[in-house]
């Protein structure tokens, strides 16, 4: 069962969120038939969207993450509602790269680093709030 756990320090200065999203990631993989590298990238994006969406105060709000890194995976989109429920897709789910020399998946290489990371927050106003930044490494933490 997927869940989000949030905690706040006594002074309110530090907030943490922890997400377990195994079911959502397995469901996404069953739908999209992703390579190991593609599902790692999509799964990380789904977790990030879920954490950020859960922070929305508006009941009908949505949060959308878009990653377009110029790598072989193409674009990645993850959408969350205010309860942390997510859906997402990767443009080229079959794309895969060999593992890195340290044995880990090369998510950064598959995403690419020549592109943008965009977050859109739609809280039911006329236009959504949109913020973008250039990708640095292609890694999705």
Features from the language model and the residues they span:
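N-terminal functional module of multi-domain proteins
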Residues: 1-120
């Amino acid at each position: 069962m997927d869940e989000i756990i949030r905690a706040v320090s006594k002074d309110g200065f530090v907030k943490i969120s922890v997400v377990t999203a195994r079911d959502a990631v397995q469901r996404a993989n069953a739908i999209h038939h992703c390579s190991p590298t593609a599902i790692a990238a999509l799964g990380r994006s789904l977790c990030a969207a879920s954490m950020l969406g859960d922070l929305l105060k508006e009941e009908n709000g949505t949060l959308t993450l878009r990653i377009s890194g110029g790598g072989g995976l193409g674009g990645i989109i993850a959408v969350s509602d205010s309860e942390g429920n997510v859906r997402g897709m990767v443009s080229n789910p079959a794309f895969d790269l060999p593992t890195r020399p340290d044995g880990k998946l090369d998510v950064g290489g598959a995403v690419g680093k020549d592109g943008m990371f965009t977050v859109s927050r739609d809280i039911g106003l006329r236009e959504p709030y949109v913020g973008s930044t250039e990708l640095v490494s292609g890694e999705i933490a």
